[in-house]
Amino acid sequence: MKLYTKPGACSLADHIVLRWSCLPFELTVVDAATMKSPDYLRLNPAGAVPLLVVDQWALTQNAAILNYIADTAPLTGLGGDGTARSRAEINRWIAFVNADLHPTFKPLFGSTAYLQEDALIQRSHEDARTKLRTLYTRVDAHLQGRNWLAGDTHTGADAYLFVTLRWAHKAGVDLSGLSALDAFFQRMLADADVQAALQAEGLN
């Protein structure tokens, strides 16, 4: 099993979960140029991460990879407690991060550079930060009295949320007063496997 990851990208979530799973895997850290190379594009025509290769099978998309890892390591609790409700809760939060939080960062990652006017670009950045504050406030409310997003142990949803929180801190998103969210972030930072994943990707 080989995971292709780009430092600090959303693929960090899959990297963390692979370490939580204790499954044997090989890590390949790639850059933007590598992701556009013919060899990489044969595996993932989107030219993006994450990419998980198992034997001759290439799997993309965070939600798919996180669920695959959970199913491949069923005794870890990464897929919940075995009930349909537990798994649905995990996937509800993976979907929230993937469909609501993650895309809201796009202006902050340069998607509005085409506007070519500093004032308009800045406005798009501020709008993104405002929307992200609203979304993270919802997560903070859910985390009150909880350690993890879904159930009694960490899952792929938590790893994915953590990755976006790293982005939020770097992008200047206002997270002040969101105490449960901050406690979650510190809990993740203290995790030995999270630290190992960050170190392996050259992150601090």
From Swiss-Prot:
InterPro entries: Glutathione-S-Trfase_C-like (IPR010987), Glutathione-S-Trfase_C_sf (IPR036282), Glutathione_S-Trfase (IPR040079), Glutathione_S-Trfase_N (IPR004045), GST_C (IPR004046), Thioredoxin-like_sf (IPR036249). The keyword Cytoplasm applies. Its main location: cytoplasm. GO terms for cellular component: cytoplasm. It comes from the Bacteria. The keyword Cell division does not apply. It catalyses: RX + glutathione = an S-substituted glutathione + a halide anion + H(+). Glutathione binds at C10, V49, Q61, N62, H102. Signal peptide: none annotated. Residues 1-77 form the GST N-terminal domain. Residues 83-204 form the GST C-terminal domain. GO terms for molecular function: glutathione transferase activity. It is found in: Cytoplasm. Its EC number is 2.5.1.18. Keywords: Cytoplasm, Transferase. SUPFAM superfamilies: GST C-terminal domain-like (SSF47616), Thioredoxin-like (SSF52833). Conjugation of reduced glutathione to a wide number of exogenous and endogenous hydrophobic electrophiles. Homodimer. Belongs to the GST superfamily. PANTHER family: GLUTATHIONE S-TRANSFERASE GSTA (PTHR44051:SF8), GLUTATHIONE S-TRANSFERASE-RELATED (PTHR44051). This is Glutathione S-transferase GST-4.5. The gene is gst.
